[in-house]
């Protein structure tokens, strides 16, 4: 693989040299005079920012604020193209070089002729055969989210997101396209492409985004080979336009709150339950009727008098631990502009997000705060330069810095083993104002205040060089493109520890009649915050290289758009433990040869195909390559003469079928090799004085381990009637997923070895997707209504499982999350049912209870 990548790098140099040489030769052959002109709308108003160029040439100029432009190297009878978003392209012929041209652009009422992003290309949406969904960056900005993909649920059909954690800096949002379609939990995420480069979507905010497109069927993702089976999310960022400098400043201040809290049992119910348990056990009650009444009153929010306020408590530990709201501040500055030669776009964002912890834990140690805080700085710049009429260069740079300050005690521990598990019958503070902690119960405020501090710093750098060469002087419609990207990532973590004073007192001693007579016992001692100690440091870098050619040309009623390219991807990760020489190194490399073509006849009939030959060095030399492909067809019925009508803006039927893969299966590096670990040993010499450690084969390798295969068929319908008064799309799909990595559970344990997972499982999935909307204008008011519907299901058709004792335990033939187990018959109750601890509670099973055998019910 190293030799292949070296060869490709060398080949890329020669190809780039050829592009530059071709551009130079084309320049030397050009000649002519200068011609001036103006671009206007039908009413004579100037159109700024219109793109103007001579036919057969790719060098463009942009009109200024008054619609004026100047073209060089023009000659008699040359054709001049003028186009602008929202208008139809117009082509005029130069008849007099001394007379300024006036080019009129008619409004474009066909919104479906605009280009949309697909795999490594752009297509008019009218002629797309793929199943896609798209949302603009402007719409994304309306959603007050700190994690971009959390807004996708409401905007993109077929996309589901689930936020498992909302900790500042550690927000974990799972994302699925067309649902969960594989048994392997490590292989469910879609591929994310930012400006045609594989990248993590979490480094982006909504401000620099122009649009997001989701590729959903296998025909659309085939060019991504063994990376595209779960769908692809294409993110396109904003670029600068020629004209005056535009500055936009945005400041957003918001507040976040908990969506819900666990409802713990109150002290009154716990007291009753404890007495009931003792009664059933034949023992005397733990609480008297008078005590039960006091617990009832305090549980109802009453304040008790005298010494009772120091003996009877109903502490809501969630209210103590959490605050009602936490601030979120987002600031953004965008600057864009340029001229005919160079254009730029710059975006700078700052995000500050605080966690939901109360400030109670901070006051016990004045050297630090226990609040969970994220400070994030995000910078992005996109630069486009017209080197000459045949060569354009783009340079994209971006970076992000995250500083995360948080308690070392994790949210799960503070919530589950703190607020949920803590006994409401115990106080937060002693009467003397010190924290209350005894040996049998937890205090979440103490846990928070004595948790110390953890600092995480993440730094990310992104860079992309994009070179486009126009080879039309050689062959009309031919162009070439080179993309090189380099990304780097670095993370550093350090921790500090501390201690907090805490006491207990004998509040159950009824002989005490004055609060000053309580006996206090110190249970925890104060410790100053220690100096930071480094935990670990990790860094990685990623290189992408893509080079190819594109041929885009129209012959009468025939249009051909074809491209061929080679693509490489290499990633290296280094992790080093603090103050040791221990660490980890890993790398990941891909190589693919790709081609795609689209043919359109008379704007009515469309066929396209794509193919990718991809290899990954993670598998055995004999099992590294596979071929992925996709085909599609579409009939644009609204272009037929018998349906052409001003009320039918679009009516299109499309279908596709393709094969894609997924190699990120979670199997680790080189799963075909066995792993070894230390285990036992043997003593040699007199009295076995010399001990030699032993090693065992801890897990067997599997040379048959490979990537998942997805084959999917998709049928869709798109429509737009009465100028978007009724528009939408409908898709049906079915997928056959095979070679899913699963555990071999039928191997006998007597072999004494952990078997490697095997590419053996199979799942079938199907679903429907519907988007329907209405847009209208009444007077000066424009309104829109849009609805999204996604439905999908799956079925396990093959996996390795032993023959179950009863049929309902079988997983094969059921949905991925639908098979039953004994544990699913229970739900976890709040940890305060009995004695401050939770109970398992039997719940009604949704399926037929007769399916459960009597012996199992008795066992339960």
Please give the residue ranges for each predicted region.
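Short, acidic, small-residue-rich periplasmic hinge/interaction motif at the N-terminus
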Residues: 40-43, 51-55, 79, 83-88, ...
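Structural motif
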Residues: 34-48, 199
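Short, acidic Ser/Thr/Gly-rich low-complexity loop/linker segments typical of extracellular
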Residues: 58-68
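Cleavable N-terminal targeting peptides that direct proteins into the secretory/outer-membrane pathway or into
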Residues: 1-34, 88
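Short Pro-Gly-centered beta-turn/loop motif in secreted/extracellular proteins
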Residues: 44-48, 70-78
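Extracellular/periplasmic, surface-exposed regions of secreted and cell-surface proteins
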Residues: 382-401, 406-410, 418-421, 440-497, ...
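Short strand-edge motifs at loop-to-beta-strand transitions and within beta-strands
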Residues: 69, 90, 99-101, 758
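Membrane-proximal, glycine/serine-rich, low-complexity loop/turn segments characteristic
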Residues: 20, 24, 30-31, 95, ...
């Amino acid at each position: 693989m190293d030799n292949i990548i070296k060869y490709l790098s060398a080949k890329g140099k020669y190809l780039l040299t050829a592009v530059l040489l071709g551009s130079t030769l084309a320049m030397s052959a050009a000649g002519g005079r200068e011609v001036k002109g103006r671009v206007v709308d039908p009413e004579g108003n100037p159109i700024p920012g219109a793109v103007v160029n001579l036919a057969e040439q790719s060098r463009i100029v942009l009109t200024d604020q008054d619609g004026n432009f100047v073209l060089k190297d023009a000659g008699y009878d040359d054709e001049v193209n003028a186009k602008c978003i929202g208008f139809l392209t117009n082509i005029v012929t130069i008849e007099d070089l001394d007379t300024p041209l006036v080019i009129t652009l008619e409004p474009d009422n066909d919104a479906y002729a605009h280009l949309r992003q697909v795999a490594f290309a752009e297509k008019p949406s009218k002629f797309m055969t793929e199943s896609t969904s798209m949302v603009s960056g402007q719409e994304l900005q309306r959603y007050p989210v700190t994690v971009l993909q959390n807004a996708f649920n409401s905007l993109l059909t077929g996309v589901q997101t689930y936020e498992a954690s909302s900790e500042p800096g550690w927000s974990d949002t799972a994302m699925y396209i067309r649902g969960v379609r594989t048994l392997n939990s490590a292989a469910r995420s879609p591929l994310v492409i930012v400006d045609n480069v594989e990248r993590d979507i979490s480094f982006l905010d909504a401000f620099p985004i122009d649009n997001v497109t989701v590729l959903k069927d296998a025909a659309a993702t085939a060019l991504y080979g063994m990376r595209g089976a779960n769908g692809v999310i294409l993110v396109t960022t904003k670029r600068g336009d020629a004209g005056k400098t535009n500055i936009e400043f945005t400041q957003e201040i918001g507040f976040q709150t908990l969506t819900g809290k666990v409802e713990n049992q109150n002290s009154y119910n716990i007291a009753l339950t404890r007495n009931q348990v003792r009664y059933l056990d034949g023992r005397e009650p733990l609480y008297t009727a008078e005590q039960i009444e006091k617990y009832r009153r305090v549980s109802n929010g009453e304040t008790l008098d005298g010494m009772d306020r120091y003996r009877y408590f109903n502490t809501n530990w969630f209210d103590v631990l959490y605050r009602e709201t936490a601030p979120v501040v987002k600031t953004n500055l965008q600057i864009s502009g340029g001229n005919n030669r160079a254009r730029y776009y710059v975006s700078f964002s700052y995000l500050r997000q605080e966690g939901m912890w109360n400030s109670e834990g901070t006051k016990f140690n004045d050297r630090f705060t226990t609040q969970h805080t994220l400070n994030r700085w995000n910078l992005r710049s996109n630069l486009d330069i017209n080197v000459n009429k045949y060569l354009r260069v783009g340079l994209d740079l971006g970076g992000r810095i995250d500083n995360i300050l948080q308690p070392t005690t994790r949210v799960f521990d503070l919530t589950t083993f703190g607020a949920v598990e803590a006994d409401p019958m115990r106080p937060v503070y002693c009467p003397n104002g010190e924290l209350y902690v005894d040996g049998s119960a937890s205090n979440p405020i103490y846990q928070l205040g004595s948790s110390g501090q953890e600092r995480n710093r993440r730094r990310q750098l992104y860079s992309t060089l994009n070179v486009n060469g126009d080879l039309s002087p050689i062959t009309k419609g031919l162009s070439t493109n080179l993309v090189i990207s380099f990304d780097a990532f670095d993370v550093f973590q350090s921790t500090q520890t501390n201690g907090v004073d805490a006491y207990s007192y004998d509040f159950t001693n009824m002989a005490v009649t004055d609060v000053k007579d309580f006996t206090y016992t110190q249970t925890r001692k104060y410790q100053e915050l220690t100096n930071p100690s480094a935990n670990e440091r990790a860094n990685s870098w990623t290189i992408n290289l893509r080079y190819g050619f594109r041929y885009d040309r129209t012959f009468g009623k025939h249009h051909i758009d074809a491209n061929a390219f080679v693509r490489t991807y290499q990633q290296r990760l280094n992790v080093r433990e603090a103050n040791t020489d221990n660490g980890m190194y890993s790398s990941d490399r891909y190589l693919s040869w790709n081609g795609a073509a689209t043919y359109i006849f008379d704007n009515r009939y469309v066929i396209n195909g794509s193919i990718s030959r991809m290899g990954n060095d993670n598998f055995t030399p004999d099992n590294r390559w596979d071929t992925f492909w996709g085909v599609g067809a579409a009939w644009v019925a609204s272009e037929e003469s018998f349906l052409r009508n001003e009320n039918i803006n679009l009516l299109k039927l499309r279908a596709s079928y393709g094969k894609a893969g997924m190699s990120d299966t979670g199997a680790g590096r080189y799963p075909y090799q066995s792993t070894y670990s230390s285990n036992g040993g043997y003593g040699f010499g007199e009295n076995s004085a010399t001990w030699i450690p032993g090693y065992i084969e801890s897990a067997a390798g599997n040379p048959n381990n490979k990537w998942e295969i997805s084959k999917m068929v998709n049928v869709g319908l798109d429509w737009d009637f009465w100028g978007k008064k009724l528009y939408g799309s409908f898709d049906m799909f079915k997928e056959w997923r095979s070679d899913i990595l699963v555990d071999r559970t039928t191997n006998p344990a007597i072999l004494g070895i952990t078997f490697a997972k095997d590419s053996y499982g199979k799942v079938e999935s199907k679903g429907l997707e519907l988007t329907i909307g209405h847009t209208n204008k009444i007077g000066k008011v424009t309104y829109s209504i849009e609805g999204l519907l996604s439905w999908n299901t799956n079925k396990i058709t093959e996996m390795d499982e032993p023959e179950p004792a009863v049929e309902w335990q079988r997983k094969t033939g059921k949905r991925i999350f639908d098979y039953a187990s004994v544990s699913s018959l229970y739900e976890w109750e709040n940890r305060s049912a009995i004695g401050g601890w939770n109970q398992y509670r039997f719940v009604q099973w949704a399926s037929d209870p007769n399916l459960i055998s009597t012996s199992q019910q008795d066992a339960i």
